[in-house]
Amino acid sequence: VATARVRLPDSLYGLMRSEMETAIREANLGNDDTDIARRYLIDQVPQIDIAAEFGWERSTISHRVKRILHKVESTAQKLHFT
């Protein structure tokens, strides 16, 4: 049985939890995307499981995660975390 995995971008991989939390908060993602970011980036919950929690399609989560990753990476860089 295959299990879904969370793949963090290299630039976010080495961040401490507190840095990740700060980058997510400072990225101003909005309520839903902030929740998705926390579940995906901090809790390491696979996209399919996040989709089930929200009652959305996995593809919707996938599109949002791409945007979230871009914003969080950019914010982490501005905060000199990366």
For the regions a language model picked out, list residue spans one by one.
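Short helix-to-turn junction characteristic of helix-turn-helix DNA-binding domains
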Residues: N28, R39-Q44
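General nucleic-acid-binding
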Residues: V1-S11
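Short, Lys/Arg-enriched N-terminal segment that forms or immediately precedes the first helix
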Residues: P9-E26
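Short helix-coil-helix linker/hinge
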Residues: E26-D33
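Short alpha-helical "packing" element that flanks the helix-turn-helix/winged-helix DNA-binding module
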Residues: D35-A37
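DNA-recognition helix of helix-turn-helix
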Residues: G55-K78
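Basic, Lys/Arg-enriched C-terminal extension of HTH/homeodomain DNA-binding domains
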Residues: T82
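Short alpha-helical "recognition helix" segments of helix-turn-helix
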Residues: D49-F54
